[in-house]
Regions:
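A six-helix transmembrane bundle that forms the core substrate pathway of small-molecule transporters
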Residues: 89, 115-116
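Substrate-binding/catalytic cleft of secreted carbohydrate-active enzymes
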Residues: 93-110, 117-261
Length: 261
C-alpha cells in the first residue's frame, strides 16, 4: 500500500512551534454500493468500491485473540501475517470483540487490508434508556475519533446480528428492527458528524424496512448481505450453493484445534 509521512505543525503568532504531530496517511476513496433487498427475481447488490474500482472481497472475521485482553497485542502480527499468506484483503472487526489496539490498524494500513468495523455490540436487543444511550455515545465517540484516521477503515457497522436477533425468539420475529434507536439514529448521526467519509451500515446483516416489509417479518434471506451458518457436512451443500446473498460477511466451519492446545 502507498502511505505517506505527514507532519502537522501549529505555530503561535511569533512563529514558535506550539505543537507538532506526525502520522502516516493514505489517500483513497471508498463507497459501499448496496441495495436494501435481494431476491431471485431482482438480485440486489453489496459491493465495496475503492478508488472507483469494485473489489472482490476475500476476508475473515477478527475475534478476541486471547481470553486475557492484556495479551492481545502479542498475537496481532502473527495473525495479520496469516491473513496476508491467505491473500485476504478485508478483515471484519466482529461486534462481539473489543476495539483493537492501534498496532492492528497500523498493520492493516501498511499491508492494504481493508477493515470493516462493527461497533462493539452483538446478538441481542440492547437497553434504550437515556443513561445507556449516553454510555454508547461516549464509547462510540472515542472509538471513531481514534480509528477514523486509518485508510484501511472502509465501513462502520452498527452491530453484529442485532437486527436478526429477534428471529431467534418465537415471540419476536415480527418486531420491526428498523425502529431501534442506537443503530438507526444515534450511531449514524455520530458517524456523519465525526467520520463522514466512511460508509455506515446499521447492522450486519442489515434488515432494511423494505426487507422487513417484503418478508413480513425478520428474515435475512431478503438482505443482500448475510451470515451463513448452516450444515457443516459439506461445503457445497445446497444451503451454500443456492444462496442468493451478494456478500457473505460471516461464515464458518468447525476447526480442529492444535495438539498443543
Amino acid at each position: 500500500s502507498s502511505l505517506y509521512n505527514a507532519t502537522l505543525t501549529i505555530l503561535d503568532k511569533e512563529g514558535e512551534v506550539v505543537t507538532e504531530d506526525e502520522q502516516k496517511i493514505g489517500i483513497r476513496t471508498v463507497t459501499l454500493d448496496r441495495t436494501d433487498t435481494t431476491t431471485k427475481e431482482e438480485p440486489g447488490e453489496f459491493v465495496f468500491i475503492v478508488n472507483h474500482e469494485k473489489i472482490f472481497v476475500k476476508g475473515t472475521n477478527w475475534v478476541a485473540l486471547d481470553a486475557l485482553h492484556s495479551r492481545d497485542q502479542a498475537h496481532i502480527k502473527p495473525n495479520i501475517d496469516m491473513m496476508i499468506d491467505l491473500n485476504c484483503n478485508m478483515i471484519r472487526m466482529w461486534g462481539g470483540n473489543v476495539y483493537e489496539h492501534d498496532y492492528f490498524y497500523d498493520l492493516c494500513d501498511a499491508h492494504g487490508i481493508m477493515v470493516w468495523h462493527d461497533f462493539m455490540m452483538g446478538c441481542t436487543q440492547y437497553p434504550q434508556d437515556d443513561i445507556f444511550l449516553k454510555k454508547i455515545e461516549d464509547e462510540a465517540a472515542k472509538a471513531i475519533a481514534r480509528i477514523r484516521k486509518h485508510p484501511s477503515l472502509v465501513l462502520w457497522a452498527g452491530n453484529n446480528e442485532n437486527d436478526i436477533a429477534g428471529e431467534w425468539n418465537e415471540d419476536q420475529p415480527y418486531v420491526d428492527p428498523t425502529k431501534e434507536p442506537i443503530s438507526r439514529y444515534l450511531l449514524p448521526s455520530m458517524v456523519r458528524r465525526l467520520d463522514p467519509k466512511t460508509p455506515y451500515l446499521p447492522s450486519s446483516p442489515y434488515i432494511s424496512s423494505e426487507a422487513f416489509n417484503l418478508a413480513g417479518r425478520i428474515d435475512q434471506n431478503f438482505a443482500p448481505e448475510q451470515h451463513l451458518w448452516g450444515p457443516r457436512g459439506y461445503y457445497k451443500a445446497p444451503f451454500y450453493t443456492e444462496n442468493i446473498a451478494k456478500f457473505v460477511s460471516e461464515i464458518g466451519y468447525h476447526g480442529c484445534p492444535s495438539r498443543e492446545s
